[in-house]
């Protein structure tokens, strides 16, 4: 197995992450779940994923799921201290360019998680609280964010390569054609739409865009 995705923890966060990957077209055979809970692993197997019963903090367990060849690791345990230990071990064993995406319950632990080697850190409790607050301030804005978070319907945030027909066009040209561009990725650097630092699209550029999932119809 190579360039696969390892999900450590298969509670609500882990299952939601797996669903997002499957909705995006990932092959379920390339998603490996690691959990010390056999029932969670049985559930992952029923979902069509590869499952391994074990403690993600242990080096031998991560080696058993070929972490040295993984493309990305999702750390979705229920406790921040456990997630830090998992992330430390994963970062040491995984390829240098492997992404490690970790969830934290408390936002004050985000810096520790990054120092442990996480590429991206998601503060779950704070994010949920912000969404609830936004829904109170504006029910329409809250509904829109909820829509974006549900990859199976409506609007969806996705990343894709610039097509041949889009080369030499400006982001503004594509916006006029109805494409909503959030960012351009060039040379590994993300340029957000409001910086206006990208004048024309080039070969190798990637775009983060909002698209409409027509499966809703």
Where are these regions (language model features)?
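Cytosolic regulatory regions of ion transport systems
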Residues: 1-217
């Amino acid at each position: 197995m190579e360039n696969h995705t390892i999900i450590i923890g298969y509670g609500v966060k882990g299952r939601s992450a797996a669903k997002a990957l499957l909705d995006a077209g990932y092959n379920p055979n390339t998603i490996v779940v690691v959990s010390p809970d056999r029932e969670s692993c049985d559930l992952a197997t029923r979902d069509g994923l590869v499952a391994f019963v074990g403690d993600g903090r242990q080096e031998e367990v991560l080696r058993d799921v070929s972490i040295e060849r993984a493309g990305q690791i999702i750390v979705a345990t229920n406790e921040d201290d456990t997630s830090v230990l998992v992330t430390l071990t994963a970062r040491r064993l995984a390829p240098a360019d492997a992404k490690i995406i970790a969830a934290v319950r408390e936002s004050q632990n985000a810096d520790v998680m990054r120092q442990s080697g996480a590429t991206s850190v998601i503060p779950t409790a704070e994010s949920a609280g912000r969404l609830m607050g936004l829904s109170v301030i504006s029910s329409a804005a809250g509904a829109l964010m909820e829509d974006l978070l549900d990859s199976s319907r409506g609007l969806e945030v996705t990343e894709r390569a610039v097509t041949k027909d889009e080369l030499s066009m400006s982001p503004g040209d594509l916006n006029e054609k109805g494409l909503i561009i959030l960012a351009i990725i060039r040379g590994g650097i993300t340029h957000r739409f409001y910086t206006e630092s990208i004048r024309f699209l080039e070969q190798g550029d990637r775009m983060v865009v909002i698209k409409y999932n027509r499966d809703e119809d």
